[in-house]
């Protein structure tokens, strides 16, 4: 197994099914808010203790941090109207691990069937929906971090 692939870690945390379930639950484009809700993003990111920068002009949040295993995580949350767009990049030893990028593209890069028209991006109809989406996504990210740290420890 290549040390520059995220696939075993994503499979370990059941990423594809978790992301599909999230998109299925929050999939009503007709009722999604015509709002960015940047303050809610800030509150949730603060609750998870992430340092981040907000690009008001481009409307995205970015957080860059390192794990104890030496992996660097770059999370970018696009604040689209009524939709949550998360990009993830993971660096290790000066290289980016694959697959990476926008979460809805990762299942196909892993070799799984994933209907992006049906399960594109989670959509929120209320601030409560947005909070639940962000908490679910951060739970996935935290589980991925843990799987990577545990996997890196097993390599030594």
Where are the regions that the model predicts?
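Heme-based O2/NO sensor domains and their adjacent alpha-helical segments
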Residues: 74-77
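Short alpha-helix boundary/capping elements
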Residues: 49-50, 69-71
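Intrinsically disordered, low-complexity regulatory regions enriched in serine/threonine/proline
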Residues: 1-16, 21-40, 63-70, 82-156
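Short secondary-structure junctions
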Residues: 46-59
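Surface-exposed charge patches
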Residues: 43
